[in-house]
């Protein structure tokens, strides 16, 4: 009995995760537009604020070509300041991360994770 022919595997992408740089902002905004069509993307002002407040918590997933295929944004919060019913806006200071609290906070809050819809598996 012969096995059915297998479809050749697509070439694997080499993706590297690194911290966000200001030069990434246009690509992050474009990624946001592809990921959430019709919704307002992150603004350069908000992305810049995230970098000012907590650069170690902002990441991009980049292909060797330089194309950005993923983005993650985090901040540290003091969980005791929040209730489970609080909104994303409450946890993120309206998306500006003004409530980032590296002194009293012990919880890394994932405010955003997006992956380009063209490469999702």
Predicted regions and their residues:
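Short loop/turn motifs at secondary-structure junctions and domain boundaries
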Residues: 49-55
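Conserved beta-hairpin
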Residues: 57-72, 85-88, 118
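Helix-loop element at the rim of GNAT/NAT acetyltransferase active sites that forms part
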Residues: 30-43
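A short beta-loop-alpha structural element at the N-terminal edge
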Residues: 14-28
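Glycine-rich phosphate/pyrophosphate-binding loop shared by adenosine-nucleotide-utilizing enzymes
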Residues: 13-15, 66-71, 108
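Conserved acyl-donor/pantetheine-binding loop and adjacent beta-alpha core of acyl/acetyltransferases
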Residues: 72-114
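Glycine-rich acyl-CoA binding loop
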Residues: 112, 120-121
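Short acidic N-proximal helix/loop "leader" segments that mark the beginning
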Residues: 1-12, 91-94
